[in-house]
Design a protein with these regions (language model features):
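Helix-turn-helix DNA-binding segment
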Residues: 340-345
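Structured, helix-rich domain cores that form ligand/interaction pockets
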Residues: 2-336, 352-385
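Alpha-helical DNA-recognition elements
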Residues: 349
Length: 385
């Protein structure tokens, strides 16, 4: 019965670099009894990955390593991307032009501004990259002089975790040179337009997890098929919750696989990243002030991360729900149940499988601490009120 459980969804199959497998938004997916008994459908370690010369190639580690569910451990939460707007006070146009001219020339300071154009000038008239010399590594995007007067005069965007403390230090030097010593005070009265919070969990892959929201949201599940021993094995590489165009969008994805495909580098073991893109707002829908960051809702709080429950011999309907969750995601599988009481019962059963390491409050506090450590903001705004 369960071995014949199938579901057809739409196809999309761009090839990936790692093997002869490919991404699919869906396919005909067979779920065998092992799926219900909480056995992940990982590719076997056997190497039958063949290149264009019909030669066997070693499989990338993210396909061959086994998850260690009992040993899974999260790193500290961090900010993966930050975008803010603010209006500096007491800065005259002549001084700003002089500062931009001076910083636009490569110099001994170790950084410089590169003028951008094109699509970057649609909202702001001037856009610059802050680049680190000796390789021209991108550190931040800086925009100014908006076309609409209701916008703040300055907008910047950076990735604190990628550029590190040294990179953030250089960005602060640019801000001081352009906007003066009190830029942190002015920034506190600005707005946070985007904040991406993330936490990496090691020794586990997304295929071992269910991800769903505490409230009704659009969700998706993206799988990768891998041809091994003459049959296709499906591995979940990404869970999504929310819409890209909304104020809230979450992803739980295989970071090791992404690093392999994008950078052709091997990650240090299995890494699953839980990442939330948030546009912080107040209760009345206004964009959140930087100084009120402590009042921002915890983006991890609306997210449930759980293991697949062990099947019960008597509750075959719940077993079918778990099997369906592997095919279409827990959120959509729950919506297939029309009876609210039954749906609520099963939702609570799924919540019982949340691992001890998933701690939304702790992860969010770590994200705020990482922002505080950058020194980009006044320390007062991080005090608990």
């Amino acid at each position: 019965m369960l071995a014949d459980f199938t579901r057809r969804v739409s196809r999309k199959t761009p090839e990936t670099r790692a093997s002869k497998g490919f991404w699919r938004f869906g396919s005909r997916i067979q779920v065998d009894i092992n799926t219900v008994n909480n056995v992940s459908s990982h590719p076997v370690v056997e190497n039958n990955n063949v290149n264009e010369n019909s030669e066997n190639e070693p499989l990338p580690p993210f396909l061959t390593l086994s998850s260690q569910i009992d040993s899974a451990v999260p790193d500290s939460g961090f900010c993966d991307k930050l975008s803010c707007t603010f209006t500096p006070t007491g800065i005259c146009d002549d001084r700003l032009r002089e500062g931009l001219s001076m910083l636009s020339e490569p110099n001994a300071r170790g950084y410089y501004l590169k003028r951008l154009g094109g699509k970057n000038d649609r909202i702001y008239r001037q856009s610059f990259e802050i680049l680190k010399m000796g390789g021209e590594r991108h550190m931040a995007l800086l925009q100014m002089n908006p076309r609409r007067t209701e916008h703040h005069f300055i907008r910047f965007e950076l990735n604190p975790s990628e550029i590190g403390m040294d990179g953030v230090y250089e960005v602060k030097r640019v801000f001081k040179a352009l906007f003066g010593e009190r830029f942190k005070v002015d920034l506190s009265d600005g707005n946070i337009t985007r904040l991406d919070a993330a936490v990496d969990v090691r020794k586990i892959r997304p295929d071992d997890l269910m991800v769903f929201s505490t409230s009704a949201r659009q969700s998706g599940l993206f799988q990768r098929s891998f041809d091994t021993s003459g049959h296709e094995t499906f591995v979940t590489e990404t869970h999504t919750v929310g819409s890209l165009s909304s104020d809230y969008f979450a992803r739980c994805y295989d970071k090791a696989a992404q690093v392999w495909r994008v950078k052709a580098e091997e990650a240090d073991g299995l890494i699953t990243r839980v990442e939330v893109k948030l546009k912080p707002r107040t209760e009345d829908g206004a964009t959140l002030r930087v100084g009120d960051i402590r009042n921002a809702r915890n983006p991890f709080g609306a997210l449930m991360v759980a293991y697949y429950p062990t099947s019960g011999e008597s509750n075959y309907v719940f077993n079918l729900l778990v099997a369906a969750a592997r095919s279409v995601g827990a959120e959509r599988a729950l919506k297939m149940i029309p009876d609210r009481r039954v749906r609520a019962k099963y939702w609570n059963l799924l919540r019982d499988s949340v691992p001890n390491w998933w701690c939304p409050e702790k992860h969010w506090d770590e994200v705020l601490e990482s922002l505080k450590a950058t020194g980009l903001f006044s320390r007062d705004i991080f005090r608990k009120k």
